[in-house]
């Protein structure tokens, strides 16, 4: 039972650890790669309501200088 709760909490943490990027992803999640990289995020996970979401990276998706 404890293992099930631990697994649930891990899944919940990963689903929350996404950052909303305002760039549109019409045409597929591959269009989110560049916006996520600019904000120093990991590769995008999915499109939600036509917008990109990215996993939080080491730099917590900080806006890069370029």
UniProtKB/Swiss-Prot annotation:
* Location within or outside the cell: Secreted
Superkingdom of origin organism = Eukaryota
Signal peptide region = 1-17
Q: Name one GO cellular component term.
A: extracellular region
Give the tissue specificity: Expressed by the venom gland.
**Record's keyword terms, sorted:** Disulfide bond, Secreted, Signal
SUPFAM superfamilies cross-referenced by the UniProt entry = Scorpion toxin-like
Q: How does it get modified after it is made?
A: Contains 4 disulfide bonds.
**InterPro entries associated with the record:** Scorpion_toxin-like_sf
**Domains: what does the record tell us?**
Has the structural arrangement of an alpha-helix connected to antiparallel beta-sheets by disulfide bonds (CS-alpha/beta).
Q: Which family does it belong to?
A: Belongs to the short scorpion toxin superfamily. Potassium channel inhibitor family. Alpha-KTx 27 subfamily.
What protein name applies here? Potassium channel toxin alpha-KTx 27.3
Can you name the source organism?
A: Lychas mucronatus
């Amino acid at each position: 039972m404890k293992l099930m709760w631990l697994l649930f909490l891990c899944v919940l943490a990963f689903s929350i650890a996404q950052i909303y990027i305002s760039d549109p992803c019409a045409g597929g999640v591959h269009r989110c790669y560049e916006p996520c990289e600019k904000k120093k995020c990991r590769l995008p996970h999915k499109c939600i309501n036509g917008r990109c979401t990215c996993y939080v990276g080491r730099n917590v998706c900080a806006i890069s200088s370029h």
